[in-house]
Amino acid sequence: MNTVRATFLLVFVLAVSLGQADKDENRMEMQEKTEQGKSYLDFAENLLLQKLEELEAKLLEEDSEESRNSRQKRCIGEGVPCDENDPRCCSGLVCLKPTLHGIWYKSYYCYKK
């Protein structure tokens, strides 16, 4: 019975001592991995920052290429009076003289084509 207890105690002590060594090794491995992970995260962060800066530069470049004259001028909607000589009707509309209603106004209106 004593030999069984002694054997059990010996196995227990070896398991605990080897377990402690493994725990220290695991701790050191985890520290190394976190340091490597931090460097990887820094690298990924810098790469993402570069891509965002490139995208921002492209967007700003496109904005600067547009001039005020390239914007579409305001247009007149359907059924709104327009000038015969300078029609500003929206696309799909034409400046025409009214046929039935509004003939007493003697004005042109924007109508669908």
Curated annotation (Swiss-Prot):
Phylogenetic classification of the source organism: Eukaryota, Metazoa, Ecdysozoa, Arthropoda, Chelicerata
InterPro entries from the UniProt entry: Toxin_22 (IPR012627)
Segments of skewed composition (Basic and acidic residues): 60-69
GO molecular function, one term: sodium channel inhibitor activity
Any one GO CC term of the record: extracellular region
Family as reported in the entry's similarity comment: Belongs to the neurotoxin 14 (magi-1) family. 01 (HNTX-16) subfamily.
Short name of any one Pfam family annotated for the protein: Toxin_22
Compartment(s): Secreted
Domain notes: The presence of a 'disulfide through disulfide knot' structurally defines this protein as a knottin.
Record keywords: Disulfide bond, Ion channel impairing toxin, Knottin, Secreted, Signal, Toxin
Expression sites (tissue/organ): Expressed by the venom gland.
Name recorded for this polypeptide: U11-theraphotoxin-Hhn1a
SS bond partners: C75-C90, C82-C95, C89-C110
Signal sequence segment: 1-21
Prodomain positions: 22-74
Chief subcellular location: secreted
Superkingdom: Eukaryota
Function according to Swiss-Prot or TrEMBL: Probable ion channel inhibitor.
Region feature (Disordered): 60-82
Keyword Plastid: no
